[in-house]
């Protein structure tokens, strides 16, 4: 039996889901633009705009509203985001190498994003928990 979650929890989960979506979309779909600026100007000034997110300012108290699976999914997703941000801000690699690595990071980030969405949807009751196990297995393969 699924326990009904509070309205505050639903709101927090929706905010986290939307934040992850917007961040992922900026990272993935603006990659050609920010990589062009990086390779042409060797400037890192535009990266804060790409990687800005609300999760960085969420309190532990607010995160306590989330279930364990969602917390694990958030950690996995935002750790990869932070790894990408760190790499782009500190790399000495040549632009072609940077672009290859970023594309690999984006592919991995997409899997983490899909998993996070799955966990949030299950916790919000948008999909049944039994179907989520099947989808998670498919995501891993």
Per-region residue spans from a language model:
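Hydrophobic/aromatic-rich structural module bridging two neighboring secondary-structure elements via a short loop
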Residues: 6-10
């Amino acid at each position: 039996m699924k326990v009904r979650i509070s309205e505050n929890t639903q709101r927090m989960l929706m905010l986290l889901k939307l934040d992850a979506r917007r961040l992922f979309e900026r990272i993935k779909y603006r990659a050609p633009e920010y990589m062009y600026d990086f390779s042409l100007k060797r400037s890192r000034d535009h990266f804060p705009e790409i990687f800005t997110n609300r999760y960085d300012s969420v309190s532990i108290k607010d995160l306590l509203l989330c279930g364990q699976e969602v917390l694990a999914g958030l950690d996995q997703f935002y750790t990869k985001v932070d790894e990408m941000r760190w790499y782009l801000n500190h790399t000495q690699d040549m632009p072609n190498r940077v672009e290859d690595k970023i594309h690999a990071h984006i592919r991995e980030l997409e899997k983490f994003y899909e998993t996070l969405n799955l966990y949030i949807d299950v916790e919000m009751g948008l999909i049944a928990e039994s179907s989520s196990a099947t989808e998670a297995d498919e995501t891993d393969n």
